[in-house]
């Protein structure tokens, strides 16, 4: 239950009744300073002062109407105009018990929308590297949450499966004594060097790009083989990462090729694009070049070749006109901001989408080394994502073996995988999305602080309590009740679950979910340390506390699921 939203709705009704404007925001915050106060209304003091003591008198009027409701135990006012709320324990217990028995934690669902999420999107012919981690796991977390909330989620893995790199690869493979697709990355590096240094190779590459566009049989055969091989490798990474992307979610750049000539002619027809020195260019007023003049965006080269911008315009049109999206979220790093804004600007001019469609760039920062430079190998090469994940599992395995030398190999393998991968993902997702962060093995694998191992361990501890009482919690006669302040604080933390879910639905900020998990686990630890659960003298207290433990464990597991992290049975 989202208590803040519930209270805000009730209080706004009173405020409108008292003549305050409909757009007035009462601002309700969880109280963390004063004992015996649950929430505080502090938006009143932001209103323009009319007379002396205006805010205090208005707070008194609002509290008068609030006192008519049975959901409040106590309402007090503090100067200059704060309203302090203590909620009724019976009302709290009714709602926490409803949450306990409900299928989806009694969360309120909005009208479902068709939401497209563009994420991961690696280039073909290269192995996924550490730079793909953020887009992949940020996008996947959002996809899981939106699906849970009943939205029609369309995941789009916009892979780079077209362009000049395939001309280079085809040229190089034709030069090899035997065409082999075993090590595409090595062939790509070789082809790139030849393309840069060898003028003959450069010309052949251009010719092979044209041949590929004209669907030459041999070129298409090589292209398909490269794409298939790369997708197979990427899928292994997704599986290891516990990411929900599947083959059906792939819609690469090549998919939109059939639309590109039509996009060019349409933009020219609408006088958005013009011919200039053999190229087709769109001039944008909102973007300036180095000379301070309108920036020109090339959408077709002299040789007739299309650019990434052209493909991305076609892609946006397809998502809006054909897939009928209500909202499109792009998980692309900060450096692509201008490129994305230019696409949206051109597509808006062409009326490829309406104002009703929400376009969002959920940008993110970089992963840095301890020296605050981009996270790379000692040689300066990009770190392969699969190698990073394997290293995480190995490090987790070493930690587990130190604590539990008798653990069986099969069990060790599974637990180390879930802890190692979980640690990498959680460490990333716990950081503010828009900021860069420093990659640190010791911090992410620590059992202390806001880390995956800490949360996974908290879950194990709760489950051990429940396992000892597998039948008692099924008793419907006794409900969750409040006997101490520790239970009350834990219940309020549980109530915040819905609030966090809806913030992530709007903003795609999973660090808030990680902070929430850490707070919830901490509140449970205090409850566990100060309240007797298994040894409670009275049956109704014992059952109440076990049920509260069960609900906490379910929410921790669900939050970890949203983050794409698996729980473990032991550590």
Curated annotation (Swiss-Prot):
A Gene Ontology molecular-function term? arginine-tRNA ligase activity
Where is this chain's protein located in or outside the cell?
A: Cytoplasm
Question: Which InterPro entries does this UniProt record tie to the protein?
Answer: aa-tRNA-synth_I_CS, Arg-tRNA-ligase, Arg-tRNA-synth_N, Arg-tRNA-synth_N_sf, ArgRS_core, DALR_anticod-bd, Rossmann-like_a/b/a_fold, tRNAsynth_Ia_anticodon-bd
Q: Which residues form a coiled coil?
A: none
List the keywords (alphabetical). Answer: Aminoacyl-tRNA synthetase, ATP-binding, Cytoplasm, Ligase, Nucleotide-binding, Protein biosynthesis
Motif, 'HIGH' region: chain positions: 122-132
Q: What is its EC number?
A: 6.1.1.19
Q: Does the keyword Membrane apply?
A: no
Tell me which Gene Ontology terms the entry assigns under biological process: arginyl-tRNA aminoacylation
Q: What does it catalyze? A: tRNA(Arg) + L-arginine + ATP = L-arginyl-tRNA(Arg) + AMP + diphosphate
Q: Which PROSITE patterns match?
A: AA_TRNA_LIGASE_I (PS00178)
- What do the Gene Ontology cellular component annotations say? cytoplasm
- Catalytic EC class: ligase
Domain of life, per the record? Answer: Bacteria
SUPFAM superfamilies registered for this protein in UniProt: Anticodon-binding domain of a subclass of class I aminoacyl-tRNA synthetases (SSF47323), Arginyl-tRNA synthetase (ArgRS), N-terminal 'additional' domain (SSF55190), Nucleotidylyl transferase (SSF52374)
Instruction: Give the chief site where it resides.
Output: cytoplasm
Q: Which family does it belong to?
A: Belongs to the class-I aminoacyl-tRNA synthetase family.
Q: How does it assemble?
A: Monomer.
Q: Which HAMAP family match?
A: Arg_tRNA_synth
The name on file for this protein is Arginine--tRNA ligase
List the source organism: Buchnera aphidicola subsp. Cinara cedri (strain Cc)
């Amino acid at each position: 239950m989202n208590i803040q939203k519930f209270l805000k709705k009730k209080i706004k009704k009173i405020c409108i009744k008292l003549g305050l404007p409909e757009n007035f925001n009462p601002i309700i915050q969880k109280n963390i300073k004063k004992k015996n106060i649950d929430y505080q209304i502090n938006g009143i003091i932001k209103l323009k002062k009319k007379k002396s003591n205006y805010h205090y008198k208005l707070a008194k009027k609002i509290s008068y109407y609030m006192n008519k409701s049975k959901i409040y135990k106590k309402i007090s006012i503090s100067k200059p105009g704060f309203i302090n709320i203590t909620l009724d324990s019976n009302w709290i217990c009714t709602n926490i018990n409803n949450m306990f028995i409900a299928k989806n934690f009694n969360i309120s669902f909005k009208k479902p929308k068709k939401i497209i999420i563009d994420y991961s999107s690696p280039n073909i012919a290269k192995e996924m590297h550490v730079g793909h981690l953020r887009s992949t796991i940020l996008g996947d977390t959002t996809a899981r949450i939106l699906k849970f909330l009943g939205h029609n989620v369309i995941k789009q893995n916009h892979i780079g499966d077209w362009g000049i790199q395939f001309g280079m690869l085809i040229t190089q493979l034709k030069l090899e004594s035997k065409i082999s697709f075993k090590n595409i990355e090595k062939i790509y590096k070789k082809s790139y060097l030849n393309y840069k240094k060898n003028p003959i190779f450069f010309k052949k590459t251009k010719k092979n790009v044209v041949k590929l566009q004209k669907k030459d049989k041999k070129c298409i055969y090589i292209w398909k083989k490269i794409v298939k091989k790369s997708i197979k490798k990427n899928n292994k990474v997704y599986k290891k990462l516990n990411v929900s992307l599947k083959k059906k979610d792939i819609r690469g750049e090549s998919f939109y090729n059939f639309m590109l000539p039509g996009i060019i002619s349409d933009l020219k027809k609408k006088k958005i694009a013009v011919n200039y020195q053999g190229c087709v260019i769109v001039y944008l007023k909102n973007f300036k070049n180095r000379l301070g003049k309108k920036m020109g965006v090339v959408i077709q080269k002299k040789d007739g070749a299309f650019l990434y911008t052209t493909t991305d315009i076609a892609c946006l049109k397809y998502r809006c006109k054909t897939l009928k999206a209500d909202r499109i979220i792009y998980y692309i790093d900060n450096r692509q901001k201008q490129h994305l804004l230019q696409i949206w600007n051109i597509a808006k001019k062409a009326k490829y989408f309406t104002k009703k469609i929400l376009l969002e760039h959920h940008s993110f920062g970089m992963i840095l080394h301890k020296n605050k430079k981009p996270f790379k190998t000692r040689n300066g090469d990009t770190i392969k994502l699969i190698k990073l994940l394997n290293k995480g599992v190995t490090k987790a395995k070493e930690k587990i073996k130190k604590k539990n030398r008798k653990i069986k190999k099969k069990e060790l393998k599974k637990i180390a995988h879930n802890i190692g991968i979980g640690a990498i993902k959680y460490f990333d997702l716990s950081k503010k999305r828009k900021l860069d962060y420093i990659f640190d093995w010791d911090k992410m694998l620590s059992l202390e602080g806001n880390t995956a191992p800490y949360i996974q361990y908290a879950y194990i501890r709760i489950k051990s309590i429940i396992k000892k009482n597998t039948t008692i919690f099924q008793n419907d006669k006794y409900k969750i009740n409040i006997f101490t302040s520790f239970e009350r604080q834990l219940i309020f933390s549980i109530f915040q679950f819905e609030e966090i879910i809806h913030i992530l639905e709007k903003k795609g900020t999973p660090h808030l979910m990680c902070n929430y998990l850490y707070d919830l686990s901490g509140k449970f630890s205090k409850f566990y340390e100060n309240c007797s659960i298994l040894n409670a003298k009275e049956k109704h207290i014992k059952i109440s506390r076990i049920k509260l433990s069960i609900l906490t464990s379910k929410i921790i597991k669900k939050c970890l699921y949203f983050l794409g992290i698996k729980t473990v049975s032991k550590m």
